[in-house]
């Protein structure tokens, strides 16, 4: 996550950070990084991101290229699942565990 700003320079569009202990803070850092703008597919399954981390990703102004985000592994209630899908938009496949 510390190298998120360099993702475009490295040509990284598919980022698999599953099972990497990326927490709420890491999710917020990624969400606020300009490098997030180049990510098309983001796999964050099985990380303790928590609700505020998921909300930060959904609210990120840099999620413009995103097509798929995997937030599976944490329980997400139906109301939050609906909010996340709405925040990410119709063009993004949001994978969660409800």
Residue ranges and their predicted role:
Residues 5-11, 15-21, 32-49, 61-62, ...:
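Concave beta-strand-loop units of leucine-rich repeat
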Residues 1, 21-28, 48-55, 75-82:
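Short, solvent-exposed loop/turn at the beta-strand->alpha-helix junction
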């Amino acid at each position: 996550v510390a190298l998120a700003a360099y993702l475009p320079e490295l040509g990284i569009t598919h980022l698999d950070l599953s099972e990497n202990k990326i927490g709420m803070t890491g999710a917020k850092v990624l969400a606020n990084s300009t490098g997030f703008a180049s990510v098309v597919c983001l796999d964050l399954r099985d990380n303790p991101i928590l609700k505020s981390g998921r909300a930060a990703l959904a609210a990120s102004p840099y999620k413009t290229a995103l097509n798929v985000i995997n937030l599976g592994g944490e329980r997400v209630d139906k109301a939050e699942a609906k909010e996340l899908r709405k925040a990410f938009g119709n063009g993004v496949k949001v994978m969660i565990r409800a």
